[in-house]
Amino acid sequence: MANSINYAAVFNRILDEKFYVLPRTMWMEDSTPGIIWEGGREVKIPKLGMDGLGNMSGYKAPQGDLTLEWETKTLQWYRGRNFSIGRYDVDETNFALTVGNALNVFLREKVVPEIDCLRIAAAAQGAVAYGQVIAQASADITTANILGLLLADIAKVQDKIGEQEQLYIQISTGLKNLLEQSTQITRYLNVKDFQVRSATLRLEAINDQYLIGTPSGYMHSVFGLNDGVTGGQTVGGVTFANLGPNINWIIAARPAVDAIARPQISKVITPDENQEGEFWKIMFSVYHGNWVMENKGDGLLVNLDTASADDLTVSTEAGASAGASTVTVTGVLPEGYMYVWKATSGSAPNVTIGGTLAATDSWAELPADGKITTTNGYGISVAIFAKSNRKAIAYVKGTVSAGT
């Protein structure tokens, strides 16, 4: 009898070897010890709480509480793709080699970039919700000031969590290039080892904090996902949605951002077994998600470009009566965010990225249909903010210019 090869096991070994070292966001993976994941879309994360010191009474210390709670998180993304290879396009002797090479390319060019994009955007959104936000026009960052700006942001994080925590700096490649041209940078740069499972990587560091150059195309605060099926989305992957500002850099202590990804080749069907036709069928899927821990938010800072949200649009049309111009807002919301709006008789209200938009200051939630009525000539601002703390991540301003 011929030997039976478990191709799924062969390809999953390739995944284990490659998947966790390729991402630029590998430092986020499994950063919290004790996470429980038993398959499915939910994970349980331990949260430890304890009281501080109190005064001794004689030889007796005051009683304190030590609590261990489990917070349930949902893996936001369940993605996959099936591939087919004709029986006669490859013979069985080199099938594993051919698919193994294709899998490497697929991981490097399709899977890992998507995961990096989504993790970076989620970290930026988490910083708006729980961490620190610095608004800085990218156009104003130069070789003369970038080192000072970056060191100042590192200090802001260390001022909250101390200098003993290792920091990770996710920076766009363009800005990293500017940083390397700084006249004083050689005083601060070094190289450090970083352990990813069984692999040891050599990463650059600034002031002993990891510095990870990342393609600028990944450094956006909002992305859309193609479903791989609908017309115009069959190519799959992510699409850039300019609903939020671009990211200059993210600075994080590892406990502040956590990510889990579980890729797998779930099944390989041979041509002899395949009921659909004479071809090999390979089924790939990945559960993944990441989140910012609210109680660790002090260890996270995002430096955002101050550009407004170009893909957030506001249109106006005449209403049925005076003071009833119809305003329609369109855009796609990130998970955990909502629209608010405010109109005044003067200029459009100011919005600060990372600033709080209070309901007591007349900021109102946008209706589900995206339509509101207000007065022609009024200035109007529409913002996207985090439900958790009402901090703005994006906005658009304009004037109601139609109606009676």
For the regions a protein language model found, what residue spans apply to each?
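N-terminal "assembly arms/tails" that initiate or stabilize quaternary assembly
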Residues: M1-Q76, D298-N303
